[in-house]
Each structure stands twice: as structure tokens, then as C-alpha cells.
């Protein structure tokens, strides 16, 4: 196994099909349960457009919109290696160059935009 590590930040939007339908922002899950995957993707697509015109706003947008508790750190997940994240998330992150922002990535947790930071 490679000891290569990456560092990334992300914005997670959960939806009806997410593995866990609650988050630090929506503890009882009422908003998440009412959100379709298409709604979640639409929300991320508009955030992604904002990010493409202003990449520096990533941590601010993550803090305001992400359903992951990493939002409290501007979406920062810290460094991780292969096998530590869900496969689609890992593959997308390792494929990015530092500073690049991913397309929409689907996992059991919901839909994500990922920014590789290291």
C-alpha cells in the first residue's frame, strides 16, 4: 500500500438517499429527508460555479453550506491516504492537482465538491 497522502477540503450536501440523514446543521434530519439527490446536485452545481470564479471562497462556502462537521474547519479534512475515505471520494481527490476543484462526487454520505489542498 502506498504511503502517499493528500489533503482536501469538501462541501457535502446530504439527501434522501444518504446513509445518515442527519448532520450537525440538521440534527433531526428534516431538511435532509426533504432533499432529493437532484436538489442536492443542483445546490452543489451553483456553489461550484461560484468557486470556479472565486476559488478562495471555498472555506467560507463550506462553512455555510456543508453538512459535514468539517464545515467548522472550512471543509478541511486534513491529510489522508488511500483506503481511508469512501472509494469514489478517494479516487476523485487523488486525481485532482493541488488547488483544483472536483466535479460532483457521489458517495453513500451524499454529494460532494472536493478541493485538493495538499
Curated annotation (Swiss-Prot):
Occurrences of domain PpiC (ranges): 3-118
Tissue expression from the record: Expressed in roots, stems, leaves, flowers and seedlings.
Post-translational modification: The N-terminus is blocked.
Stretch list, region Disordered: 1-37, 61-84
GO cellular component: cytosol; nucleus
Catalytic activity from the UniProt record: [protein]-peptidylproline (omega=180) = [protein]-peptidylproline (omega=0)
Keyword list, A-Z: Cytoplasm, Isomerase, Nucleus, Rotamase
Highest taxon in the source lineage: Eukaryota
Regions of compositional bias (Basic residues) in chain numbering: 12-22
Family stated for the protein in its record: Belongs to the PpiC/parvulin rotamase family.
Name used for this protein in its record: Peptidyl-prolyl cis-trans isomerase Pin1
